[in-house]
Amino acid sequence: YKRQVYTAEQYAEVVRQLRAAYGDRPVSFTTDCICGFPGETEEDFRESCAFLKEIGFLKVHVFPYSRRSGTPAYDFPDQVHEREKQARSREMNAIAEDIRREVLAGCEGSEDDVLLETPLSGTLFTGYTRLYVPVVVSAPGHKSGEIVHVRLGSYDGERVRAEMV
């Protein structure tokens, strides 16, 4: 239905190959998930949730399927009820956040480069590592657009606290 050109098994194999190729160096993955696409069963949904756990995505953008006139899926049979789409989206978001916490906990103590983006106050900046880990770091004497080397700390539910090294 969704015009995927690959299977979950093929995707998982590519992830395994990439992780093997990078060895001890970390690699991260992000994805988008649509909940409640026409024809999605409870079993399909459970398989999708299990797949998220298997891969260990750093970030998952979850959203409910939205029926749009003029699209092929508009007339597909087995439209999923709006309440069910919303419930599945909430559940998948919770699962994705648990996975994110696990992935980011595994980064604690590691070092990486961060592109400083948004100044918050004084010397405090938000930014992202090369692996798309969101951080907040105090970087006195630096400005947005610069790259600094940091040690990653704990995840606060929004960003990883980091310190310059």
Regions found by a protein language model. Give the residues of each.
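Terminal RNA-binding accessory module
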Residues: 75-165
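Conserved non-cysteine loop/helix-boundary elements of the Radical SAM core domain that shape
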Residues: 2-59, 65, 70-84
